[in-house]
Amino acid sequence: MDGNPDVHGKTIRETLHRHEQVIVSTYFAECGQLAETLSQSANRVGVSAALAARIDSYSAILPGAQALAPARHDRMPYRVFFGQIGERLKATYEGRPNAYQNPDELLADVGCAADSLLENRGRHAGYFLVRRFMRRVRTFGFHLATLDVTQHAHVHDQVIAQGLGLADWPAMAPEERLRQLRDLLARDQGPTSALDAIGRRSLWVFEAIAQARHKFGGRAIGEYIVSAAQGPEDVLAVLLLARWADITDKRTGESPLDVAPLLECIDSLERAGDILRALCREPAYRRHLAARGNRQMVVIGYSDTNKEGGIAASRWALQVAQVQLLEAAREAGIKVLIFHGRGGTPARGGGRTENLVEAVPDGAIRGVLRLTEQGEVVNQSYGLRPIAMRTLERTFASVALATAHAGEKPPLPPAHAAAMQTIAARSLAAYRELVFGSAGFFDYFRAATPLDVIERMHIGSRPAARAGGDGVRALRAIPWVFAWTQSRHMLPGWFGFGSGLSAALEQHGDDVVAQMVAHWPFFGHLLDDVEAMLGRTDLTIASHYDALAGDALRAQAEVIRREYALTVAHVLRLRGSARLLDSDPTLQRSIKLRNPYIDPMHLMQVDLLQRWRKTGREDRALFGALRATISGIAQGLQATG
């Protein structure tokens, strides 16, 4: 799915089956603990008639539970009952008769025990433990964790092209595809041409979603995310394919999917409000939304927008898109939930969650926050129980405060918006001039970073580059950021920001920009992130990597050095500091302590790269050593992609 050929309908089913086994095993263990704890004797404490009836019923159909319980436990009804629940959970795990068909059946059993405890002097004799078990069942069901499904919009177009026998479908104007989709949905027309294996496999995903929801509950599957969405036609395409897969409601014709467009380029973010308005004007989709509670999720992508336009233009496009989405949703009378698809590093939107919450536009967070947590940073935030609890506490506190004070943020001064627009526009121009407009830049990038090693390491769930393209545009965001991190250029985290600040200071004045730093959390946190990336940048180390590119490509390195010097000068001026990160001494000290250990690994990596490339990239021993340096530098910097 979305670039990973190993993810398909079978993967969804197998993943949820494994989820079920994990959570059912956990429930089974908790039942054993409850059976040990709730040892009340029927000679002293009564039980409800409903519980007594259930125990008798299960005694007849669950002989295994009866055989496992010692005879002396016969007069301990709660112990007997939770043993019976455990037997049903065991049957659920093994797929035997008498298994729980859904978590509601388990909840009914546990609830019966809770009611009996309340009725029979058990409020302080196990009731809390049983209620806690009920909360866990309500939270995790039999699905444990909700799966979102992501597919690229182009894949949907290819399947529709096959099904309609229209080879030029992907190349059609968006307006024409939208018109035809509108007509196909109105006529409920199925495919008129046979699908190949890839097309059938795409429809099997929809069938797997329907089966998963039937077996594991409605919460087993979350959003169906359409990546690289450009307009309403990319969302309507999903509704059409759902009909072709025959998973729609036979009575109403509505799809059981929550479809979320992923806006991951600057152009689509700039049109975010118009896209949502156009989508809400489509009769078929408006009926679909009504059936889903008039709730629409939109995913905004931090990673590819940064690769496309640099950090300042990316962050501003994301901010403006959120304002537009909130306004469009208000006009349409629906609720929009913004899903922040961010990466692990500041260049890809990473950082403290509370900073993200504080920086979003007023009203963008009302009791709910959806964001991605990248695998490479999960251990930092959740690896130890105390750290995980601290992460959750800080996240909950920030969301609670944002919700409580929604509608109270002062309006953004026009002067601040104008200055930020200037920063974004000028930084975008500087970034694109280097990355996309400079001859030989991609050759320089490949030579002056260990990208060729990273590509062969097969890190992550998808190939390093998208099929059918070349250059920076085809490269995925993770290897793009990771390669610059390894060489200590850290370019995606700061390049262009200095040029943007120069333009803003010249056109709008020092006072306006200083006010933005002091009173606008969005800009303050952007400045924090840029300064942190500048603090990790080491152009002395980077110069050794630049030497690998040779004299013919040295002009690229000079442009980077000039922009770095400009950006550092402006950041220090705005901070009123003599050194980078004087305002964050903890991070400053951490970098200073780590550098002596990391720097030798960089020098080793440069030497190994030179030797490995001379062998035609065939020497496996050198490649193994390069892998070790990449891992060591990543651990030392605590940063990947």
Where would I find each of the regions flagged by the language model?
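Catalytic or ion-translocation cores adjacent to nucleophile or general acid/base/metal-coordination motifs
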Residues: 7-38, 245-429
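Active-site cores of enzymes that catalyze phosphoryl transfer or operate on phosphate-rich substrates
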Residues: 77-78, 91, 145-148, 152-236, ...
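Acidic, glycine-enriched catalytic cores built around paired aspartates
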Residues: 65, 143, 148-150, 155-157, ...
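Extended, well-ordered protein cores
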Residues: 1-9, 19, 154, 230
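Beta-sheet entry/capping signal
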Residues: 4, 134-135, 142-146, 219-224, ...
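Extended, highly charged clamp/arch subdomains and adjacent linkers
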Residues: 5-7, 14, 21-150, 157, ...
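Flexible, glycine/threonine-enriched loop-and-boundary segments that flank and lead into catalytic domains
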Residues: 237-238, 348-353, 461
